[in-house]
């Protein structure tokens, strides 16, 4: 596989942004160690925006010959008050539920979970030189920049927070350098931390990424954030600028069960959630059901996606590209209910191996039902 083919795998849907493609090409060309990482807070049930979006990209990275790693951010979750702010509970959930759920998600998206290294944050945070790296980074970042970066925690600028939360962004940047990560991966909501990492990379004294004497900047790969199924807080949305302002409120949320499908949901739960989903007729710009179709079903194109309908409503129709589907929906040739039902059936089949695993091994879900899920 040549360099351009490997780059195309990194750019493949659901990737939304690479900072930068030129730097990625440079890493391939100089033969730098290719170490990926994606970090997750341990905060509740795994939904499709976490399991399938990250799983899809991990599969792509593996095909491109990149070592893959999942960072189970237990301390970060504690700082951000997840699971009642109980560090021991967070660690138990990380190892007994989250790790298993992500392994199964990677598998259904075509990756090999056996080739993913899982690292618990506390395994490295106990090392003294980790905190040297945190301080080194912090000395190169202003307080106002840190305050603007708290949105990576799902917090709003101006929100009242405890001091520990100001350490969080610098820890997230330190995680990259301390682990020798050359490809930092996350959803678009983590962009601010990754931009800081790129900007400070060549200023660091502790744990810079060095290859053949050159201080390297990490590449940041950001995947699409699936829209939540709920109606947006403002409707209609009249501009792209307005959409950007409320996008954070439109993503899937573990605390709003009907905004998300979880990887273990039953067929009936999936159908019910899709039936209730916001999906206005002819609306193609701000439509969560179409958004899911584009980034899950039509991740690979061409594909075959068949929508079953009674003959009196046009009969079955098969689409091979998302643009075909989008065009028919925009023209009113495809009814929202038919689209919802077809997407639900696709997800039911896709998630079947995960569902069956948890039916055979109920202990992880039993653990989750016993813990306090917060935020």
From Swiss-Prot:
InterPro entries: aa-tRNA-synth_Ic (IPR002305), Rossmann-like_a/b/a_fold (IPR014729), Tyr-tRNA-ligase (IPR002307), Tyr-tRNA-ligase_4 (IPR023678), Tyr-tRNA-ligase_arc/euk-type (IPR023617), Tyr-tRNA_synthase (IPR050489)
Keyword Aminoacyl-tRNA synthetase appears in the UniProt entry: yes
Gene Ontology biological process terms from the UniProt entry: tyrosyl-tRNA aminoacylation
Catalysed reactions, as listed in the record: tRNA(Tyr) + L-tyrosine + ATP = L-tyrosyl-tRNA(Tyr) + AMP + diphosphate + H(+)
Binding locations of ATP: 254
Binding site for L-tyrosine: 37, 168, 172, 175, 190
Top class in the EC scheme: ligase
Keyword Protease: no
EC number(s) given by UniProt: 6.1.1.1
Pfam families noted in UniProt: tRNA-synt_1b
Entry keyword set: Aminoacyl-tRNA synthetase, ATP-binding, Cytoplasm, Ligase, Nucleotide-binding, Protein biosynthesis
Sequence motif 'KMSKS' region, location on chain: 251-255
HAMAP family referenced in this protein's UniProt entry, alphabetically: Tyr_tRNA_synth_type4
Subunit record text: Homodimer.
Family label: Belongs to the class-I aminoacyl-tRNA synthetase family. TyrS type 4 subfamily.
Function: Catalyzes the attachment of tyrosine to tRNA(Tyr) in a two-step reaction: tyrosine is first activated by ATP to form Tyr-AMP and then transferred to the acceptor end of tRNA(Tyr).
Cross-referenced PANTHER family: TYROSINE--TRNA LIGASE, CYTOPLASMIC (PTHR46264:SF4), TYROSINE-TRNA LIGASE (PTHR46264)
Name recorded for this polypeptide: Tyrosine--tRNA ligase
Organism this protein belongs to: Pyrococcus abyssi (strain GE5 / Orsay)
Gene this protein is translated from: tyrS
């Amino acid at each position: 596989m040549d360099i351009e083919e490997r780059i195309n795998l990194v750019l493949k849907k659901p990737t939304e942004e690479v900072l930068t493609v030129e730097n990625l090409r440079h890493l391939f060309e100089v033969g730098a160690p290719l170490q990926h990482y994606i970090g997750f807070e341990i905060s509740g049930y795994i939904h499709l925006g976490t399991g399938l979006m990250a799983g899809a990209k991990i599969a792509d990275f593996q095909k491109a010959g990149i070592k893959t790693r999942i960072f189970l951010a237990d301390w970060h979750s504690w700082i951000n008050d997840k699971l009642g702010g109980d560090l021991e509970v967070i660690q138990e959930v990380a190892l007994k539920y989250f790790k298993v759920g992500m392994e199964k998600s990677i598998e259904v998206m075509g990756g090999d979970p056996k080739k993913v290294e899982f690292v618990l944050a506390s395994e490295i945070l106990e090392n003294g030189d980790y905190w040297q790296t945190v301080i080194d980074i912090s000395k190169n970042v202003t307080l106002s920049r840190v305050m603007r970066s708290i949105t990576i925690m799902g917090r709003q600028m101006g929100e009242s927070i405890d001091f520990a939360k100001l350490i969080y962004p610098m820890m997230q940047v330190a995680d990259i350098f301390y682990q020798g990560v050359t490809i930092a991966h996350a959803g678009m909501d983590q962009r601010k931390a990754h931009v800081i990492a790129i900007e400070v990379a060549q200023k660091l004294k502790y744990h810079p990424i060095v290859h053949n004497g050159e201080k390297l900047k990490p590449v940041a790969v950001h995947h699409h954030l699936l829209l939540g199924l709920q109606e947006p807080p403002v409707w209609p949305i009249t501009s792209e600028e307005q959409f950007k302002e409320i996008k954070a409120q439109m993503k899937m949320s573990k605390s709003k069960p009907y905004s998300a499908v979880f990887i273990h949901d039953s067929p009936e739960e999936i159908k019910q959630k899709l039936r209730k989903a916001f999906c206005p007729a002819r609306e193609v710009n701000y439509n969560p059901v179409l958004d899911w179709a584009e980034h899950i079903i039509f991740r690979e194109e061409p594909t075959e996606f068949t929508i079953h309908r009674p003959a009196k409503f046009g009969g079955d129709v098969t689409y091979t590209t998302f643009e075909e589907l989008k065009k028919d929906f925009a023209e009113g040739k495809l009814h929202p209910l038919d689209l919802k039902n077809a997407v639900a059936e696709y997800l039911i089949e896709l998630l079947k191996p995960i569902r069956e695993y948890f039916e055979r091994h109920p202990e992880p879900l039993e653990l989750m039902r016993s813990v306090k899920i917060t935020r």
